[in-house]
Amino acid sequence: VTTVPTRTRVLAGAALAAGLFCSAAPAFAALTSPEATAYVVSADALNNNVAVPPQPLSTYPPGGTQTLVGLTVGPFATDAALTATTAGDPTLGTSSASATVDHLTLTLGPALAGDLTGVQATCSADPNGATGNGVIASGTLTVLGIPTTLQANAPKNTSVTVPGLGDVTLNEQSTDANDVLTVNAVHIVLLPALGGANVIVGHVECGGAPAAGAVPMIDAQVGVIGGSLAAAAVLGTVYYRHRA
């Protein structure tokens, strides 16, 4: 029978405990300070037009309101005001954003048109997470003279397929690994035959962060595993001293 030295057993036990700690502890990714983004329109290149970058664009920090009165670019046309606003408070770890336009028309291709009213995307975030909403008061997408009515105040991630045009998501919402919430009031993805372009109306992003000076909370699972590791180390040390 081969006898393993006591010191070897202690070191092996500590290594095993450390391995369990590293493998079982979940990975965390979080913002260190709050952030927010808002814009009213953006589009990939389509209809022989260049891509439309996000506009008007507001980001926090530093935050503030950006406004365009009237717009004719790419597939978009309106004489209404487009307004994007962001704000935040690092002391509280909060952020907010909004993107609005009262009326907007879309030209997505030959005999492909759209009309939207009352577009509003909003979000807010704090250290515990983010919430948001993206709505329209009314909307239609018309293909070869045949209109498809878009739902007003749609539940999040409402999907609509428009024959001859593509897919539309109303009140589109997603959250990334940093708990940053993204909301699109209207997101159109054209058919591949039409170029597969993305067209977005009403976009906001919000991410919260720990309040300034706050002590980060330790995840319960990490706490349990960490406590077990500490206990194992203490017991191993006692055992080793007893055998020495």
What role is predicted for each listed range?
Residues 13-23:
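Bacterial N-terminal signal peptides
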